[in-house]
Swiss-Prot record:
Mg(2+) binds at D168, E197, D220. One of its GO terms (molecular function) is O-succinylbenzoate synthase activity. Belongs to the mandelate racemase/muconate lactonizing enzyme family. MenC type 1 subfamily. Its EC number is 4.2.1.113. Transmembrane segments: none annotated. This is o-succinylbenzoate synthase. HAMAP family: MenC_1 (MF_00470). NCBIfam families: menC_gam_Gplu (TIGR01927), PRK05105.1 (NF003473). The gene is menC. GO terms for biological process: menaquinone biosynthetic process. Pathway: Quinol/quinone metabolism; 1,4-dihydroxy-2-naphthoate biosynthesis; 1,4-dihydroxy-2-naphthoate from chorismate: step 4/7; Quinol/quinone metabolism; menaquinone biosynthesis.
Length: 329
């Protein structure tokens, strides 16, 4: 009979000094690395996102140790220990480790990313020229003036005729501001906006924005609200799934299947995980949303990769002996 074991590590990686989350600078990305073993190993990342996750890293660590200890004290063929009631980041990281250990998480990943739009359109065009499949990029809006955001989005769409844009407003706009944005985007360009995530402060205002502008919208923050119910709506084209903020792989696949049954696109997206977590998100995307470009273009915000390399990245990789990683158990 195989013996169970687990380890837990804590990492702290320097990030881009310009990274702002919810109006505050994030100087380091911190999280937990979990290893589980029962005949074979599985790894996962537990990394609550400051300002977005309901749980702190310390709370996640305490809960992860409790869950892993319970799991470890049972035999390998014992019924699965449920993840119900655990924090989203804990449920996601542990489910990744368990599915990897059991061989449920396929090895192949979708490493095509939607690059972030900023700077010179020619530089973005060079990135997109080498991409296979749909040429899609992402642009954050709502931080600067709505008029400015609209002009820049329209500039990219004008400069790159086959570009599809995904926009993310994080509920920053009033309806008036959102309409100011749309006014700067030419009518013929609006259909190449795949979706605008949560343009307004409420779902009702976002729906009204979509009706008035004919710009498709997507739910992101709404998915994580209590009693959220995904329904088919006239201008809703996608649901954005951030597993670190939502929960286990099983919970995420339920949402994916629900979206697909309604004819909606499901997009796996990053919560600024390390390369370990990002590579597992790429595998989840390939396994469950194989024809959709995931939103995972966040690794360059970091100064290092953790344990596993992201294909094509030349960032240095740190291992368990690194000064950036501390063993807890």
């Amino acid at each position: 009979m195989a013996e169970k074991s687990f380890n837990l590590y804590r990492y702290s990686i320097p990030v881009d000094s310009q990274l702002i989350l919810r109006d505050r600078f994030l100087k380091r990305r911190e999280g937990l690395i979990v290893r589980v073993s029962c005949s074979r190993d599985g790894w996962g990342e537990i990394a609550p996102l400051p300002g977005f996750s309901e749980e702190t890293l310390d709370q996640a660590q305490e809960q992860a140790i409790e869950w892993l200890t319970t799991w470890c004290n049972a035999s390998c063929d014992a019924p699965r220990v449920p993840l119900d009631g655990t924090y989203p980041s804990v449920a996601f990281g542990i489910s990744c480790a368990m599915d990897e250990m059991k061989g449920y998480l396929q090895a192949e990943g979708n490493y095509h990313t939607a690059p972030l739009c900023y700077g010179d359109p020619d530089e973005l065009y060079a990135k997109l020229a080498s991409m296979e499949g749909e040429k899609v990029a992402k642009m954050k809006v709502g931080i600067y003036e709505a008029n400015r955001d609209g002009l820049i989005a329209d500039m990219f769409l004008e400069a790159i005729p086959d570009l599809q844009l995904r926009l993310d407003a994080n509920r920053h706009w009033s309806l008036e501001k959102a309409l100011q944005f749309a006014a700067k985007v030419k009518l013929q360009h609006r259909k190449r906006i795949q979706f605008l995530e949560e343009p307004c402060k409420t779902q009702a205002l976002s729906r009204e924005f979509a009706v008035q502008t004919d710009i498709a919208i997507a739910w992101d923050e709404s998915v994580r609200e209590p009693n959220f119910c995904l329904e088919k709506e006239p201008h809703l084209s996608a649901v954005v799934i951030k597993p670190t903020l939502i929960g286990s792989i099983q919970r995420c696949t339920e949402l994916i299947n629900q979206a697909h049954s309604l004819g909606l696109k499901a997009v796996i997206s990053s919560s600024i995980e390390s390369s370990l977590g990002l590579s597992q998100l790429a595998r989840i995307a390939q396994q469950y949303t194989p024809n959709v470009t995931p939103g995972l273009d966040t690794l360059d915000l970091m100064e290092y990769q953790v344990l596993r390399a992201w294909p094509s990245s030349d960032l240095p990789i740190v291992d368990l002996e690194s000064e950036f990683i501390t063993k807890i158990i």
